[in-house]
């Protein structure tokens, strides 16, 4: 199963040799269920990424939690707070994966292009899911919960982990030209689901 973003990332022509190399890797072990693309420069799909080294939890939910920890519940969020979160959290969680790096074992990824083994897709008991509840704690230690968007690929990808399968970002599987991308903390505020 091939999944591809149909925005500007999906327009990039992936090198045919790297697609073949990726398929060889995918089928090199029975327990590899899926492979995902990388980008030159900043890896742009932090929302989907879950692993033990780079991003254990939802990137944008953690951005929101970092914002809330710096304000009181009634405060307006200032540009200074947003800049602090950008410097203290986002910049530390912005990565580039060298094309010569070894495949990166992950719990979830996408990067605009992914290939899954159909056998594992058919055995996947999880579906695409786009909402979650996020716990928030403010500067005065008051807490609340909020409905928040969730990257739809994550739950689906966890279904492969449930099957004891492996997923990988392949650093050589490039699907975007060099781009120095920065993530804006305001995006986290836009992902709050208002009822």
Question: Locations of the language-model features?
Answer:
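Short aromatic-hydrophobic micro-motifs that form the base-stacking/packing surface
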Residues: 2-5
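Conserved catalytic core of nucleotide-sugar-dependent glycosyltransferases
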Residues: 8-134
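C-terminal catalytic/acceptor-binding lobe
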Residues: 94-195
């Amino acid at each position: 199963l091939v999944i591809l973003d149909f925005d500007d990332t999906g327009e990039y022509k992936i090198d045919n040799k790297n697609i073949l190399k990726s398929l060889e890797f995918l089928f090199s072990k029975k327990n590899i269920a899926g492979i995902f693309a990388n980008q030159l420069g900043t890896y742009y799909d932090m929302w989907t990424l879950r692993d033990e080294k780079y991003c254990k939890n939802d990137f944008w939910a953690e951005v929101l939690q970092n914002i809330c920890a710096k304000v009181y519940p009634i405060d307006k969020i200032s540009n200074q707070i947003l800049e602090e979160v950008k410097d203290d959290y986002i910049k530390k969680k912005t990565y580039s994966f060298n094309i010569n790096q070894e495949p990166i074992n992950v719990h979830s990824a996408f990067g605009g292009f992914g290939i899954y083994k159909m056998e594992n897709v058919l055995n996947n008991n999880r579906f695409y899911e786009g909402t979650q509840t996020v716990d928030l704690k403010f500067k005065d230690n008051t807490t609340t919960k909020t409905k928040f968007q969730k990257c739809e690929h994550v739950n689906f990808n966890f279904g492969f982990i449930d099957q004891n399968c492996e997923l990988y970002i392949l650093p050589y599987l490039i699907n975007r030209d060099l781009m120095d991308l920065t993530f804006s903390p305001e995006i986290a505020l836009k992902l709050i689901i208002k009822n």
